[in-house]
Amino acid sequence: HPGTNMVFLCQPNNPTGQLAEPALVEALLRRCEAVGAVLAVDECFLDFLPEGEGLSAKHLLKNSKKLIILKAFTKLYGMAGVRLGYCLCSDTELLARMRAAGQPWAISGLAQAAGIAALDETEYVAKVRALIEAQRPVLADGLRALGLRVIEGRANYLLFRAPEALGEALRRK
């Protein structure tokens, strides 16, 4: 659409957990380039998938200045209070503008140390991924057994639809 400056894509989608195929992400990037828009891809939950690295749009960075990829330590490593994430982009001018618009304080020493330590936790990451792969169908089956409609997804979360009466009952509690 004319006048569009940025398109934002969650990979996997939040709240459905659905994945966009890499070819679709690339086609979306090419369309953004054609109209002068930036494609921002939030890959913060992609790290939970064993095949996440292969689904990342990182390989598209070398040929496009219209791509921003957002990543976070806070999700996979359970460090929400540390507030540590990063942005990948090959457009140095855009990065400079983002840096200038950012918060005036630097990342704390504690956050830096936590991030560096997290990078060495490959065994932890493998265990978390395996646990999610094993427990996602168990949780989905349990929700279905309660009569809830579960939307199949690949993320570490599930979207389900409950009857209106359940929502009303929970609000009253």
Language model: regions and residue ranges:
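Conserved PLP-binding catalytic core of the aspartate aminotransferase-like
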Residues: 132-133, 141-173
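A short, flexible beta-alpha/helix-coil linker loop
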Residues: 12-15, 122
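PLP-dependent aminotransferase class I/II
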Residues: 66-144, 148-151
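Structural motif
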Residues: 6-10, 40, 86-88
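Structured helix-beta-strand junction loops
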Residues: 2-3, 35, 63-64, 101, ...
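Alpha-helical structural signal in soluble globular domains
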Residues: 27, 31, 59-63, 138, ...
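Active-site pre-lysine segment of PLP-dependent enzymes
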Residues: 1-3, 15-39, 43-74
